[in-house]
Amino acid sequence: MEEKDSKPSETAAEAQRQPEPSSGGGSGGGSSPSDSDTGRRRALMLPEVLQAPGNHQHPHRITNFFIDNILRPEFGRRKDAGTCCAGAGGARGGEGGAGTTEGGGGGAGGAEQLLGARESRPNPACAPSAGGTLSAAAGDPAVDGEGGSKTLSLHGGAKKPGDPGGSLDGVLKARGLGGGDLSVSSDSDSSQASATLGAQPMLWPAWVYCTRYSDRPSSGPRSRKPKKKNPNKEDKRPRTAFTAEQLQRLKAEFQTNRYLTEQRRQSLAQELSLNESQIKIWFQNKRAKIKKATGNKNTLAVHLMAQGLYNHSTTAKEGKSDSE
């Protein structure tokens, strides 16, 4: 780690020594030699102090975005000019680190002049100049990475230089992209997700609405809902009023055979001037009354109830049957 930190400082020192003859004439801003000396000292101190946390935490900067950036709603809304300026920030920083300025400002490549030139330049300055200074500076990877880290770190220099969090915030604010977005965006996305979940009402799962507890054997006897007596609403089938002659003929047929065949039901319907459904229902009700009065249950039902597999007892009151 110490060898990696010492190499960028040596390259920066060599880069600052090269433009010393042209430092007096290239300071178009009227800066004195003392200002250039202080700028040179600051440039020499920057790689050791500010570059280390940036390089250790972001060794790979091949892509400009991560998956978290793609999932953000504002992804793809940046203008071409903004991305151009953000992408060319490293190359312009390398230009300042090498000591050559495009407009002739700050021959020593001071950090203050670099920031001033970056803020004062309009958007067309993002394009490389005709002399090829940007391409030449970008060709040297060491100088490019060093200068880029200097400008990015100084741009977000509101915090202490030794604080890695401060340098990370500076990088994120200066470029809007980069490796630091992975951790920061995950925190922001989680906070946004929790906020949206808190705003939505509580949702119940589907099985709460679909489960029928009466279908389970452990639910006990099923209870019928008592019928609400509504005088306004008429019954679908009016109660059949049998005459005395009809009741005598039905009872005689029931004593002969409790179960009607289709032919017997049709003949009775014609003789008594009734519907087949009315005769069928009367026979069903009559069989149910006798079965309940005797109390004899089916042997299969008794066997299943003993095993706990059959329980059709009801708790509601039974309605009145058809008149005899």
Curated annotation (Swiss-Prot):
Question: At which residues is the DNA-binding region annotated?
Answer: 235-294
Q: Which Pfam families match?
A: Engrail_1_C_sig (PF10525), Homeodomain (PF00046)
Tissue-level expression reads:
Cerebellar granule cells.
> Which domain of life does the protein's organism represent?
Eukaryota
Q: Name one GO cellular component term.
A: nucleoplasm
Homology family: Belongs to the engrailed homeobox family.
Tell me the protein's name.
Homeobox protein engrailed-2
